Amino acid sequence: MSSYAYVTVIYGNNIYLTGALVLGYTLQQTNTKYDRVILATKDVSEEYRSYLKKYYTHIIDIDYVKVNEDIFLEENTRFHDVFTKLSCLSLTQYDKIILLDLDMIIAKNIDHLFKLSAPAACLKRFHIPYGQKIPPKMICSNGKLVGSINAGLMLLEPDKREWEDIKKDIVKENFIGKFKYPEQDYLSLRYCNKWTSITFNYNFQFGLTHRVKKYHYTIDNIYVIHFSSSYKPWNRLNSDKSLREDETDFFDQHIKYYNLWMNIYSKIKHDFSKNDIKLPY
């Protein structure tokens, strides 16, 4: 077992399986030296796990993590189970982990990120040079959030005591505040004076066109592509789901990124079909 690992999380049986396969496949293609771990809630079926084994070195069972509902700023939030992904902090067999969202493509090898001090992530809205400490004043002031990191890609150090403390914290009745992006805002505040900067080309959200233009990022000089909007690439695989006009416009505007994801997924389906295996999507 390596001292470092890439970690992602899958909840239940649903179309997010496609994201997990694309993420795992692209990680594998970068020839990383380190483990590729997927944490799976116990309602992920054996069938789905059999697909995931092709691209992940370890599949580890986890339980859903519940929180005090007062933590959510939006009543019908899509982030109800999002703190479950912080179960990765219990993986103390690793010195450091990189936690990744499923809606990502790893375009180039990123093993060098493990050399940074943890915790590390990309600061939203502002540029801090790679590897530098993010000034606390850009994240919090007087115990309140004024900025945030993006939690789609984070370098973390597993710590079971820290994880137990977080689990106690997020069920408190007198929780510190309401968050639109719950685990992201919570961790931003919790580690306000500890964050190291990972630059935008390691968490490339192509929908943020002002940042894309300002720093001249293109599909050729980025490491990780993040489909962070609600317009997920696998929506096009779901024939039962009709796209809204704004979704269609967004897809059309950023078609090269969605086509890249679709081409990778088509290759994955083809690889499985060689063994007479038909994926559910």
Swiss-Prot record:
Subcellular location(s) of the protein: Membrane
Keywords: Membrane, Transmembrane, Transmembrane helix
Cystine pairings recorded for this chain: none
Gene3D superfamilies found in the cross-reference section: Spore Coat Polysaccharide Biosynthesis Protein SpsA, Chain A (3.90.550.10)
GO cellular component term of the entry, any: membrane
Bilayer-spanning residue ranges: 5-27
Its membrane topology: Single-pass membrane protein
GO molecular function annotation: glycosyltransferase activity
Pfam family, one: Glyco_transf_8
InterPro entries from the UniProt entry: Glyco_trans_8, GNT1/Glycosyltrans_8, Nucleotide-diphossugar_trans
Protein name as it appears in the record: Uncharacterized protein R707
Native organism: Acanthamoeba polyphaga mimivirus
